[in-house]
Regions:
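Transmembrane helical bundles and short interhelical boundary loops of multi-pass, membrane-embedded
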Residues: 15-18, 491-549
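Membrane-interface helix-loop-helix junctions at transmembrane boundaries of multi-pass membrane enzymes
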Residues: 201, 251-261, 299-301, 399, ...
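Transmembrane alpha-helix segments characteristic
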Residues: 14-18, 265-266, 430-452
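Short hydrophobic/aromatic helix or loop-helix immediately within or flanking a transmembrane segment
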Residues: 125-173, 276, 380-381, 386
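Membrane-interface alpha helices of multi-pass inner-membrane proteins
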Residues: 223, 244, 248, 256-284, ...
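Transmembrane-helix motifs of polytopic, lipid-linked glycan transferases
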Residues: 163-165, 179-202, 415-419
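Hydrophobic, aromatic-rich transmembrane alpha-helices
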Residues: 381-432
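Transmembrane-helix signature of polytopic, membrane-embedded enzymes
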Residues: 174-179, 195-217
Length: 549
């Protein structure tokens, strides 16, 4: 089947050249060099996105689960020939345009005294890594120097090396940060066709549609996907690995060529993650090993597969420990010991920073037993970014808009992730139930670990959490389908619990910043929230039991 034709170039080529001219005009340096560099990146991005979208959509073949749906009932997003293309278009456009607008607006409407914002960067890590990438690209040093400890702002070196490579050969005259913004948007969008194809094959069209739209439109991923960060690359490599694994697990004995393709995509995904962050590769391996164990019916595993997993896992441990302990100060004596020491020291530091930077947290820490501090930091981290704070904390307009969008996105996603366990338990097929329970367990373990690692930071915490966003989108998509089919009342009840939390905390923040309403002591407010939650929870149990009688 031909999935890419010369007709595609009739729009790809002129659009790439036109957008390349616009981007080159927005950046300093020789216009012709910038135009050629940007045009090449646009041409590559549009070609690969078109190719992968057509491939994932099967050239217009019906989605699994929609074949028997009458044509007159397939409207809007249920038309199998429309949704994936629109997802990819919106995913790329929103991230790229948002990244360009942020880059141009922050030096004007942000905090101009801030070094990162005055340079057009929303993330400090992105700014520092970008600056070091340009320094390396404009020097006489080899690109692989990105992996030594001289360049400390990229802990693992992979993205720094790639960024320097782009600058050295596509922007040799001047520093053009928008090239990396373009590549981030491209990588984020490239994950969608693989996510779509894998979820459609594994769970059907409805989960594929819901997961795809959540992935395409989630605000935190829009901001990260429009920045020169590692997360968009994580999502793309995770999607490659997901598709390779799903295709491998669901292959038939006579599909030897499919087995080869599956191994290639799986290796590409895991290998890419190892270069960017070994810990993400290790987390993905754990997810897929558990998945394979569940799908194989606890049967025997081939020797080559077991050896490959063990070798890659051990290599990942060594890469991670060496990256974390570049200066040899953590000790531990082994990769696991080094990683354990790093996590312990990192959590201590984050708790200290949270207490130091917030007067009311200092007050709460003074009033609570010491054993409660770590659980408090964990819960506080899970609720970051706090939606009421986004409305009331004093800041610039551009940052208020960004904060509200990020918080609304998380507080929409959070109930779905809470319900993911219930949705998994409600699956009629045993293997499907076990698989979604496994994915829910891993995602929530990751959320808790990142809440500890990021503390109460409203930027690092959500960013760490979003590293496994691809899997969160799958869980949330399954919850949406489960609720639409079952009309389970716990969907509304969990949202009601969240509404109670937002009302109380909204009033607390309103009193703190604009002196609106009475001031409840923090402990009393928590007790009130817990009481309302208990009423909703036990009333829900009573209603369910009454209906079942």
């Amino acid at each position: 089947m031909k999935i890419f034709s010369q007709r595609d170039f009739l729009w790809i080529l002129p659009l790439s050249l036109g957008l390349g001219a616009v981007l080159s005009s927005l950046q300093l340096g020789n216009w012709l060099i910038g135009w050629l560099g940007f045009s090449f990146l646009f041409l590559l991005s549009f070609s690969l996105l078109t190719l992968s979208t057509k491939w994932a959509n099967g050239g217009g073949l019906p989605l699994r689960g929609l074949r028997d749906t009458p044509l007159e009932k397939r409207s809007g997003l249920l038309d199998h020939q429309k949704p994936l293309a629109w997802m990819v278009i919106l995913a790329f456009t929103l991230r790229f345009v948002g990244g360009v607008v942020t880059y141009l607006a922050l030096p004007v409407y942000g905090y101009v005294d801030d070094e990162d914002q005055s340079a057009g960067f929303a993330y400090t890590d992105a700014h520092r890594r970008d600056a070091q990438a340009w320094d390396l690209a404009s020097s006489d040093l080899p690109i692989y120097d990105a992996f030594n400890k001289t360049y400390a702002y990229d802990q693992y070196g992979g993205l720094l090396a790639f960024s320097a490579l782009v600058y050295r050969y596509l922007s040799p005259d001047v520093h053009r940060p928008l090239m990396l913004v373009l590549l981030s948007a491209f990588m984020a969008a490239l994950a969608l066709p693989f996510l779509w194809k894998a979820t459609n094959q594994q769970w059907g069209a409805k989960v594929a549609l819901a997961s795809g739209w959540i992935y395409a439109l989630y605000p935190e991923s829009l901001l990260l996907g429009g920045s020169a960060m590692r997360e968009p690359y994580f999502w793309a490599f995770s999607a490659f690995a997901l598709w390779g694994f799903v295709n491998f697990v669901n292959r038939t004995p006579i599909q030897s060529q499919e087995t080869l393709y599956s191994r290639v995509w799986l290796a590409l995904g895991i290998g890419g993650m190892l270069l960017l962050s070994p810990i993400v590769a290790l987390a993905t391996i754990i997810i897929l090993v558990g998945w394979f164990y569940i799908s194989s019916g606890h049967g025997r595993v081939s020797w080559w597969l077991a050896i490959a997993v063990v070798v890659v896992f051990i290599a990942g441990l060594f890469l991670l420990s060496s990256a974390l302990d570049r200066n040899g100060e953590l000790g531990g004596g082994s990769p696991i010991g080094i990683i354990n020491n790093f996590m312990r020291e990192a959590v201590k530091w984050d708790v200290y920073q949270l207490e130091r930077d917030s007067g009311w947290v200092q007050k709460l820490f003074d009033e609570m037993p010491e054993w409660m501090r770590l659980p408090f930091v964990t819960v506080y981290g899970i609720f970051q970014p706090v939606l009421p704070a986004a409305f009331f904390e004093p800041t610039k307009l551009i940052w208020r808009i960004i904060a509200i969008l990020r918080a609304v996105g998380w507080y929409t996603m959070l109930p779905a992730l809470i319900l993911s366990v219930g949705a998994a338990a409600g699956q009629s097929v045993e293997s499907k139930r076990r698989l979604f329970l496994w994915l829910s367990f891993i995602v929530w373990m990751w959320i808790i670990i990142t809440a500890l690692r990021g503390g109460g930071d409203s930027w690092d915490n959500p960013r760490y959490r979003t590293i496994l966003f691809l899997w969160q989108a799958i869980l949330a998509g399954n919850v949406w389908v489960w609720w639409r089919e079952s009309k389970n009342a716990w969907f509304q009840r969990v949202f009601a619990m969240e509404l109670v939390f937002l009302i109380f905390f909204g009033q607390w923040y309103a009193n703190r910043y604009i002196h609106f309403g009475p001031q409840l002591p923090f402990a009393l407010m928590v007790i009130c929230i817990a009481a309302f939650w208990a009423v909703i929870f036990f009333w829900g149990l009573w209603r369910d039991r009454k209906r079942s009688v």
